[in-house]
Amino acid sequence: MNIPADLLYTKDHEWIKVLDDGTTALVGITDFAQSELGDIVFVETKPVGTELSEHDVFGTVEAVKTVADLFAPVDGVIVEVNEALDAAEVVNSSPYEDGWMVKVSLKDASQFDALMSAAEYSEMVGE
């Protein structure tokens, strides 16, 4: 299972990567999550401009046998939705690169302290 060391993780199996500008971040679901969900057929996110609070539902992932909510790892505003999600299977094939869900403008970097490192997430999922 792939758990990149340069990302932070949530107990809900989302990841977040702060971009080089330090003010925006990409959010997606983990390799573990996509594996557990199975073949993903549809992803729906809230639109650009949506304000999020930590743990808010910002979308859903629909797989062949289940639907799962997507939870915001931190406070922010959605500034971009990944158009590659029109082909939802990209989340299965590339959850950390091409299959990211939303880009958010960050509000409070101190919230990162509550997120897990790759080692902590790996331990949580038993890898």
Curated annotation (Swiss-Prot):
**Domain Lipoyl-binding stretches:** 24-105
Q: How, per the record, is the cofactor bound?
A: Binds 1 lipoyl cofactor covalently.
Task: List residues modified as N6-lipoyllysine.
Answer: 65
Q: Does the keyword Cell wall biogenesis/degradation apply?
A: no
Give the record's keywords alphabetically: Lipoyl
Pfam families for the chain: GCV_H
One biological process term in Gene Ontology: glycine decarboxylation via glycine cleavage system
Looking at the keywords, is Membrane present?
no
Cofactor list: (R)-lipoate
What do the Gene Ontology cellular component annotations say?
cytosol; glycine cleavage complex
Query: Which branch of life, at top level?
Result: Bacteria
What stretches pass through the bilayer?
none
Its annotated function is as follows: The glycine cleavage system catalyzes the degradation of glycine. The H protein shuttles the methylamine group of glycine from the P protein to the T protein.
- Entry similarity comment: Belongs to the GcvH family.
Cite the PANTHER family for this sequence.
Answer: GLYCINE CLEAVAGE SYSTEM H PROTEIN, GLYCINE CLEAVAGE SYSTEM H PROTEIN-RELATED
Q: Tell me which NCBIfam families the record gives.
A: gcvH, PRK01202.1
Describe the subunit structure: The glycine cleavage system is composed of four proteins: P, T, L and H.
Name of the protein this chain belongs to: Glycine cleavage system H protein
Organism for this UniProt entry:
Prosthecochloris aestuarii (strain DSM 271 / SK 413)
Upper classification of the source organism reads:
Bacteria, Pseudomonadati, Chlorobiota, Chlorobiia, Chlorobiales
